[in-house]
Amino acid sequence: VTWNGWGLGLLVCYDVEFPETVRALALAGADAVLVPTANMLPYDHVPRVLVPARAWENQVYVAYANWCGTEGSLTYGGLSCVAGPAGAVVRAGRDPELLVAELDRSALAVSRRANPYLADRRPDLYG
């Protein structure tokens, strides 16, 4: 979907943990991928490692909004973040808080020129 000139993609929770989901959205024109989630402990590697990697390898912003707190026997990890196409990350903590990030279209262009992963793909080799 396009909003104010930005291509937006939407994934839900676990979907962001698969490289091909973000790649498909990037190839379809997404500039930013929005991910509402309720990820539990001990899966901190998702916001700390996978979300920034998905942003960088696809040259998009990824906004990962995770639930935090405890419900029954489950503790949700928080660590919501916005990862940029060059690896910069703004991160929230374990407690509820508002995370605000300004997305810079020129940063997308710079990053896409420096790391042309989408253009350098070789789908003929892997299907």
Task: Explain the meaning of each model-derived region.
Residues V1-N58, V62-Y64:
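Active-site beta-loop-alpha substructure in enzyme catalytic cores
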Residues W67-G127:
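C-terminal beta-strand edge segments of enzyme domains
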